Amino acid sequence: MKVLFTTDITEEPFTLTEIKEALKITGSAADDELERMITDARIYIEKAIDTSVTARTIQVTSLEKMEEWELPYGPTADLALTYGTDWEGALTYIYTYTGGVTTCPPEITRLITDYIKYKYDIDDEAIALPKSIKSQIQLLTRQP
């Protein structure tokens, strides 16, 4: 399965100022790193919960026929199915749809914020995710 974001999100679900406030950071020394962390955390959480935090156009090419709920980065809207062939001539299913919601739900914003706090506070990448973050991910993961 190949996933292509044909139009990606235009802005993150929250601002640098909001993250700095949540982390109780003053000054601008860490601004560049925090900006990167916002994007990295959003991408990580989107993959973990299989949900797009804001609406964007997605194209999925698959050798298998898929149900709407199986498509990544849902929820899905405006689904269109076309057919193609791969380089070996096999039939492919090409799904184009809007994935995600118009506004990032507050519980997902909180999860992303908690993840950024965790990443900002650790010095060792080998430390496992806290149970509280794992639990939130489990609760927010899209179900069939």
Regions found by a protein language model. Give the residues of each.
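Divalent metal-cofactor coordination and adjacent catalytic microenvironments
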Residues: 1-144
